[in-house]
Amino acid sequence: QVARADGGVTSNWIHDSLKIGESLKISGAYGTFIGDPAVDTPVLCLAAGTGLAPVLALAEAALRRGFRKPVTMLFSARTREDVYSQGMMAWWRTKHRNFDYKITLTREEAEGYLAGRIDVVLPKVFSDLSKHTIFAAGSPEFVETCVATVKKLGAKDELIHTEGFFAQQQPVVA
């Protein structure tokens, strides 16, 4: 499923032009996000929207190789309808004692979910991030907010890794 992103080149093309049954040739993602945290600190993964995909892959790689430090996932979604992969995260929580996740909703309140944007919620969940490695993925605005917030909580620049999604310049076709 592809969610329409405001101003998103690809998601809007899919919703407006692609017909059911049409074929696409796609290739892998080409981001710069690190694939497996080779760190010896607790890990905090922050994600919004489709930014959850790379941090889920990162967390899964770490857990599969036996990473022992705490891994916490904080996922921000507008509504419960926008939440995906919650079942997998719940399963990881039962299988890996060092994994935990929390979901925050920004446009509704619901039992079992935190409420509010990352910059408001994060200080309520963590008071000190000086010993954490941070991975943040999502829109550029989300990532910028995460970086500013974790720095206020003591995170060190060298332990902050980001993946901000942005519209890439389209090739000129002659």
What are these regions (language model features)?
Residues 50-55, 142:
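Hydrophobic/small residue at the entry helix of a nucleotide-binding pocket
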Residues 1-23, 77-79, 104-108:
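Ferredoxin-reductase
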Residues 36-39, 65-67, 127-128:
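Short, flexible hinge/linker loops that cap or flank conserved catalytic cores
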Residues 9-10, 31-38:
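Short, Lys/Arg- and Gly-enriched loop/turn segments at beta-strand edges
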Residues 36-50, 153:
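Short, compositionally biased
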Residues 71-174:
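Reductase modules of NAD(P)H-dependent flavoproteins
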Residues 54-64:
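Histidine-anchored nucleotide/phosphate-binding helix
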